[in-house]
Amino acid sequence: MLIHPQFDPVAIHLGPLAVHWYGLMYLLGFALFLTMGKYRLKNGNDVLTVPQLDDMLMYGAVGVVVGGRLGEVLFYQPGYYFSHPLEIFMVWKGGMSFHGGFLGVLIAVAIYGRKVGRGFWQLTDFVAPLVPLGLAAGRVGNFINGELWGRVASPELPWAMLFPQARMEDIAEAQQSADLMNMLMQYGGLLRHPSQLYEFALEGIVLFGALWIYSAKPRATGKVSALFLIGYGLARFVSEYFRNPDAGIFGKSDVISMGQWLSLPMIVIGVALLVFFGRRKQG
């Protein structure tokens, strides 16, 4: 059994300013995006210039923050945020939806593409392999915050983890069965999957490796983007089985979660695009 370290969510105090780990993970994600993007541009990819990459990152950063926050508000906790509207702007507390941020980035890329005269799929093919490392950094931020913990795990699982932050939810969930109540009494809480780390591995490291290797050779326009949709959708769909389900706009369900509902269209659209772009190249 492991116990979550309960990190201080504030990394650095600069006078009255508190710099949170969650925000630093976003900055790390942006830095990795720039580093890997510039590497690609200096090694044969001429879709953008380096200054244009810097500019596009600014567009994308606005898209991911605005879209991610609106996605959290609309997809997961509309009732809470509509009752506490000022908290919509408290992004340092966490609460960012990937799917909302993804839509925000797509809009930002489309706007920037029109500005510089580049095709939408050209840009998304370039961006897709650069995104997963940022996702990995975000999941590290979730773990540091002790949020988005997993479903109840067997005590026999060596890395089953006790999340002290989940105490109230543990007590409520333990009322459902004698086994859970016994676990609560024995360990002082329910042992859970560290699902943030599963998502770090699947949506971050594994997806990055697959896309980076696949995109190293010239591919038909749109195919790298399609592979990202399929890869992320599958990784998120699988990891959601270990993550404590969010309520979402359809209510809380142990059968299919809100994250899975939002990932299904990504998989379907990704497969359709892969077929479409493959046939267009053959034609």
UniProtKB/Swiss-Prot annotation:
EC number(s) on file: 2.5.1.145
Keywords, comma-separated and alphabetical: Cell inner membrane, Cell membrane, Membrane, Transferase, Transmembrane, Transmembrane helix
Name of the molecule in the record: Phosphatidylglycerol--prolipoprotein diacylglyceryl transferase
GO molecular function: phosphatidylglycerol-prolipoprotein diacylglyceryl transferase activity
Primary role: Catalyzes the transfer of the diacylglyceryl group from phosphatidylglycerol to the sulfhydryl group of the N-terminal cysteine of a prolipoprotein, the first step in the formation of mature lipoproteins.
Protein's membrane topology: Multi-pass membrane protein
Organism encoding this protein: Chromobacterium violaceum (strain ATCC 12472 / DSM 30191 / JCM 1249 / CCUG 213 / NBRC 12614 / NCIMB 9131 / NCTC 9757 / MK)
HAMAP family noted in UniProt: Lgt
GO cellular component: plasma membrane
Keyword Electron transport among UniProt keywords: no
InterPro entries in UniProt: Lgt
Binding site for a 1,2-diacyl-sn-glycero-3-phospho-(1'-sn-glycerol): 139
One GO term (biological process): lipoprotein biosynthetic process
Enzyme class: transferase
Pathway(s) of this molecule: Protein modification; lipoprotein biosynthesis (diacylglyceryl transfer)
Subcellular location: Cell inner membrane
Transmembrane segments: 14-34, 56-76, 88-108, 258-278
Keyword Transmembrane: yes
Entry's family note: Belongs to the Lgt family.
